[in-house]
Amino acid sequence: MDSPSPENPSGTESPNPKSPQTTGTRLSHRPASRQKPALDSNTRSAPIPDDEHGADLPITMSASVVLSSLPRDAHRALADAEAVDTGKVTVRFQPLPSAPILKNRVFKISASQKFETVVKFLRKKLDCKDTDSVFCYVNSVFAPGLDEGVGGLWRCFKTDDQLIVSYSMTPAFG
């Protein structure tokens, strides 16, 4: 290891130990100093003081409301969201390998129904016993929860305006 010399007190930690250290001269390839210039007391910015908030001041709900009414766009968006779940949704059942095939694969269901209704309907069409298992997957990708809305699934995962539900009697995907 090199020992620090009087010309180069930093020793080997310097990026270029063999070049003499320049004092007072700024080279164009070196970054500027990170020290902030001294400011006058007139130009120095003071920190913004924190407001004193009393935790004991009761605030009513009406005082905390920012908007008195919803904007028109929000009303329209809410109306559109409610309208989606009022119609009918087309569901196409796709059998996975080793699953029984339905004679009619396309059915309509109310968009406001839960996915549980789809599974119960499929079990009835397949003449399943209470002990038989049916595994359903949307677009052969994921198994939705039984409490998921059919309208929301259709809106997010539809293919050619149909909700594709693949089914199997054994687990098909990990």
Swiss-Prot record:
Its main location: membrane. InterPro entries: Atg12, Ubiquitin-like_domsf. Forms a conjugate with atg5. This is Ubiquitin-like protein ATG12. Residues 1-56 are annotated as: Disordered. It is a peripheral membrane protein. It comes from Aspergillus fumigatus (strain ATCC MYA-4609 / CBS 101355 / FGSC A1100 / Af293). One of its GO terms (molecular function) is protein tag activity. PANTHER family: AUTOPHAGY PROTEIN 12, UBIQUITIN-LIKE PROTEIN ATG12. GO terms for biological process: autophagosome assembly; autophagosome maturation; autophagy of mitochondrion; glycophagy; piecemeal microautophagy of the nucleus; protein transport. It comes from the Eukaryota. It is found in: Preautophagosomal structure membrane. Residues 8-26 have a biased composition (Polar residues). There is a cross-link at G174 (Glycyl lysine isopeptide (Gly-Lys) (interchain with K-163 in atg5)). The keyword rRNA processing does not apply. Keywords: Autophagy, Isopeptide bond, Membrane, Protein transport, Transport, Ubl conjugation pathway. Ubiquitin-like protein involved in cytoplasm to vacuole transport (Cvt), autophagy vesicles formation, mitophagy, and nucleophagy. Conjugation with atg5 through a ubiquitin-like conjugating system involving also atg7 as an E1-like activating enzyme and atg10 as an E2-like conjugating enzyme, is essential for its function. The atg12-atg5 conjugate functions as an E3-like enzyme which is required for lipidation of atg8 and atg8 association to the vesicle membranes. Belongs to the ATG12 family. One of its GO terms (cellular component) is autophagosome membrane. The keyword Signal does not apply.
